[in-house]
Amino acid sequence: MGKRWSFVAVLLLTVSFFSWLMSGTGEARGGKEVQPVEQQTKTILFVPHDNRPTSCEQSAEAAEKLGYRVLMPPKEMLGGLTEGQPDALWYWAEAQAAQADAAVISTDSLIYGGLVASRKHELSEQELEERVGRIASLKKLNRRLKVYAFGSLMRTPVSGLASGGEEPDYYLTYGAQIFRRSGLLDKQEHGGLTDGETQELQDLAATIPSEVWQDWTQRRAKNFTVDERLIDLSRTGALDLFILGKDDNAPLSATHAESLWLARYATAVPCTRFQMLAGIDEFAALLLARAVNDEEHVVPFVNVQYNWGVGGAMVPDYSDEPLVDSIQSDLLIAGAVAVPDPAHADLVLLVNTPPDGKMGYGNAPDNDGTDLYDAQSLARYAGSLIAQGYRVVIADITRTNGADNALMNALRDEGLLFKLYGYAGWNTATNSVGFALGQGVLSVRLPEDDVDCLLLARYLDDWGYQSNVRTAVTNQLAMLLDGGAYLNLGRYEPAVRLRVTRLLRDFAARNLPPYPGVDHLNFYFPWHRMFIGGIVLPDR
């Protein structure tokens, strides 16, 4: 792998070096001004992997603000907690492809009907093969179209609770046992088991009903074959780039085992055509950035820095690889390259990692503003970089599913919130890093007002909702109504939506500078559950 990375890095550095020599510099927002490339309006066909705001409009927003026309299917075609309309999505994509310069497509949507549907489907092998064939035909029918595709390896949640009801129903009962059994099988193949583990594996086989295990493993086998066929498409050039995500992964699991098998299968495919890494929800933002960078023949320089401590060596929750490896993959996906000196960078990606490498949770009681991860130092360092003229993007990953309140309070108090060029602190660490990078490499070319608009969405969601309002309202639901309402709001949804809207407006008034429309923002639940929210401003 080292030689493959070295070759690509040298190639990208060469292209970028000449671009840098030819570029002029000025001052804007505390950083060097990057002028957008003059161009005619370009069109990107975009099929998201589900209907969440982060998957759809938020992933596309930076490209749209740069002047690109991003064609997205009607949301009713996309999957959510239930299957979308893969046939309708295909006919829509086929009809729109002729007017597009590039396509960023979710193979999960076009084959299974969405990300969640990929874990629950009852499709036959023949149906799956036919749908893979459709994707292959997209390039044949539109020779000039660049096709960037992304899909997921079927995940292996650690328990029924962790699955969030997004697996087959039996996972709520047997999820922990399925996860453990798959992990022991992974270890058995790649390292061997102790006598105690061998006995535990036998006990688990007796505990999990055979029909449950058969259903789960047979679906995985079908999806695995689909992934092999998609890798073949990247091998032959039917896909210009295919990214396969190890969704909600762990070092010992079925997902990890399958990734090793697929890595061997793809040995001869260059990393410029196929990559496999932890994550999934961030891939649309990264590939849309890649499509823009390819169209404009731009290779952004990115300087990556971490909080003190283990930094890039940490293996984040829901991942099976060191963070530094995931970030290197993200850079290549976005068409960017890492540089050691921030003076030569288009942006500095500052990663807020926990010093000991152990992540917390956005909804944990200790996320009360107490500085557990030396956030004050990170905020001051970000301020010093900005004062020196560097464009800074922050990936906030000390916690899963929400921002670090201590960091955000420090950025607020130092007046830095709207001096950044990007921020993300939502869901998993790899989601946040990839999304921050995908938006960041484009936002450095945007006017300040547009950058502020992108930042506002993240602050309201990642900081306001996920780390504060959601936690408060969830606790109230548990005490006053029904703890089960978290996963299915049911009849409580209208009242909860009003409560969240009011609290989020109050949060913005206390923590953010005045911004048009924030005092009239509205909130909704795309999947009718507390975990995922959507924020709408009157003028957006």
Predicted features along the sequence, with ranges:
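Bacterial N-terminal signal peptides that target proteins for export
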Residues: M1-A9
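Signal peptide processing junction and immediate N-terminal pro/mature segment
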Residues: L21-E33
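An N-terminal assembly and electron-transfer interface module characteristic of large anaerobic redox
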Residues: G31-R540
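Generic low-complexity, intrinsically disordered sequence content enriched
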Residues: V15-F17, T25-G26, N142
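Bacterial N-terminal signal peptides
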Residues: A9-W20
